[in-house]
Amino acid sequence: MFKLDLKRFIRDIPDFPQKGIVFRDITPLLRNQEAFKEAIDRMCELVFDREFDLVVAPEARGFILGAAMAYKLGKGFVPVRKPGKLPYKTVYEEYQLEYGTEQLHIHEDAIEKGQKVLIVDDVLATGGTAEALIRLVKKLGGEVVSLAFLVELSYLEPRKRLEGYDVKTLIVY
C-alpha cells in the first residue's frame, strides 16, 4: 500500500533555467530510497494494464525513471539522447522546450516495426519533448500505447498537444 506524499519530495527552484520558470527538482525524491521506490512502483501501477514491448525515455532524468520501470516490468529500454551522444546511426526530431529548441536522437534500429512502446519522462511541461518522442517512435515504425510522467505541469496545458494518447502522471501541479 502506498503511503508517501511524493509531492513533498519535489523541490521548487524559481527562475531556473531562466527567469520566470519554476523548475520542479526531483533529485530529493531520487535521493530518498523509500520515495524513489514508491514513485517507481506507482508509475508502474499506472501502466499495469497496457501491453507494450519497450520503454523509451529521454536523457537525463527520463533515463532514471524509464530504466527502473523497464527493469521492474520486464521490458527492454531504449535511450533517447541529445545530438552526438549515441554511437550508432540515428534519426532525430527537433522540438521546442519551455525555454528553447533542442533535438532528440534515437538509434535507427532501436524499435522494430510494430513494436508497442511506453514513453517515460520525469516532467510533462509543454508537451514538446513528448511530441518529439512520439514522432521518433512513429518514424521507426513503433506504436506509442501510453506515456507516463512523474510530474505534470497542468497549468501549461500539455495534454492539448497529446490528444488521442493515453497520458498518465503521478504528481500534478
UniProtKB/Swiss-Prot annotation:
Its main location: cytoplasm. Its EC number is 2.4.2.7. CDD domains: PRTases_typeI (cd06223). It catalyses: AMP + diphosphate = 5-phospho-alpha-D-ribose 1-diphosphate + adenine. One of its GO terms (cellular component) is cytoplasm. It is found in: Cytoplasm. GO terms for molecular function: adenine binding; adenine phosphoribosyltransferase activity; AMP binding. Pathway: Purine metabolism; AMP biosynthesis via salvage pathway; AMP from adenine: step 1/1. Keywords: Cytoplasm, Glycosyltransferase, Purine salvage, Transferase. Pfam families: Pribosyltran. GO terms for biological process: adenine salvage; AMP salvage; purine ribonucleoside salvage. Catalyzes a salvage reaction resulting in the formation of AMP, that is energically less costly than de novo synthesis. PANTHER family: ADENINE PHOSPHORIBOSYLTRANSFERASE. HAMAP family: Aden_phosphoribosyltr. Homodimer. This is Adenine phosphoribosyltransferase. It comes from Thermotoga maritima (strain ATCC 43589 / DSM 3109 / JCM 10099 / NBRC 100826 / MSB8). The gene is apt.
